[in-house]
């Protein structure tokens, strides 16, 4: 009798388990589709460990270039340990992304860009550290580093929205980090800049204005080079060393950090024993 009761108990337990599995399966099938946020895209991340063949750069190691990297003028000189030296003037590097950042003559997709560089002498006036689509720029202007963008809302009237910080010193590596955010639904567009982790003022457009795109450079970025095709812009290259350049989605995390940024702690976390989180 004890043996028979045990068998009955086992069958009852098995029926309950089978029913539970069936209910769980139905519940899983009935779940609504849940949107999963896509990871931020990285379009360019190079330290110039690859090679230039003629005008085109071939990435090396784990470098990223979702598009083409091209030199203008002379072939950049490679530095021991990574990086290149740009001669300035009409020389520089451009990145043409396979992703679209513009439509109808406007930069309608935001992005982040980072560059680690060093100058050995004060840059010439309007020498360009970074540019995008022809009317987004970071450049020397006298004793200042000027950054901003130009808009052309009416098709005939140009508006410039710029801010500036003190020009970084020579013979020292510096990191610039910028974020362009196009205004949505009639809002203002913005360009934010940090130099070695210190943020400058935000360049902000009038409501509804987006950075303008110059002819044929809708998805083009300049590294130590001005991509604007106007004849006066062709000689605005930066003379200096570029160690790394990166372009990513506007919500991507920063990747190029100096010691001061890595060690920044405001102690809003917690201690567990001797460890801080």
Question: Which residues are covered by each model-predicted region?
Answer:
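Bacterial N-terminal signal peptides
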Residues: 17-30
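Short, aromatic/His-centered strand-loop micro-motif at the edge of beta-sheets
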Residues: 148-175
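Extracytoplasmic low-complexity segments
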Residues: 33-92, 183, 202, 206-217, ...
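Extracellular glycan-recognition modules
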Residues: 40-43, 52, 89-148, 184-186, ...
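Localized edge beta-strand/strand-to-loop motifs within extracellular or lumenal beta-rich domains
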Residues: 172-191
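N-terminal secretory signal peptides that target proteins for export/translocation
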Residues: 1-13
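Short strand-turn-strand beta-turns centered on an Asx-Gly dipeptide
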Residues: 194-198
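Extracellular glycan-interaction patches encoded by glycine-rich segments
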Residues: 87-90, 152, 215-243
């Amino acid at each position: 009798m004890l043996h028979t009761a045990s068998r009955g108990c086992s069958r009852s337990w098995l029926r309950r388990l089978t029913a539970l599995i069936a209910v769980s399966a139905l519940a899983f099938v009935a779940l609504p589709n849940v949107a999963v946020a896509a990871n931020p895209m990285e379009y360019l991340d190079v330290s110039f460990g690859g090679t230039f063949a003629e005008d085109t750069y071939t990435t090396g190691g784990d470098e990223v270039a979702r598009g083409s990297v091209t030199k203008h003028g002379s072939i950049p000189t490679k530095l021991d340990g990574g990086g290149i030296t740009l001669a300035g003037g009409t020389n520089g590097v451009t990145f043409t992304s396979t992703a679209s950042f513009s439509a109808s003559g406007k930069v309608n997709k935001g992005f982040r860009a980072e560059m680690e560089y060093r100058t050995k002498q004060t840059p010439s006036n309007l020498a360009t550290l970074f540019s995008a689509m022809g009317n987004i720029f970071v450049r020397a202007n006298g004793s200042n580093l000027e950054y901003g963008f130009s808009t052309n809302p009416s098709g005939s009237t140009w508006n410039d929205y710029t801010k500036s910080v003190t020009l970084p010193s020579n013979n020292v590596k510096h990191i610039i980090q910028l974020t362009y955010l196009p205004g949505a639904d009639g809002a203002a567009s913005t360009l934010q800049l940090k130099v070695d982790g210190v943020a400058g003022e935000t360049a902000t457009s009038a409501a509804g204005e987006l950075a303008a795109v110059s002819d044929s450079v809708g998805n083009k970025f300049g590294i130590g080079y001005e991509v604007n095709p106007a004849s006066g812009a062709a000689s605005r290259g930066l003379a200096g060393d570029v160690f790394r350049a990166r372009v990513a989605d506007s919500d991507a995390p920063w990747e190029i950090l100096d010691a001061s940024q890595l060690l920044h702690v405001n102690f809003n976390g917690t201690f567990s024993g001797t460890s801080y989180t």
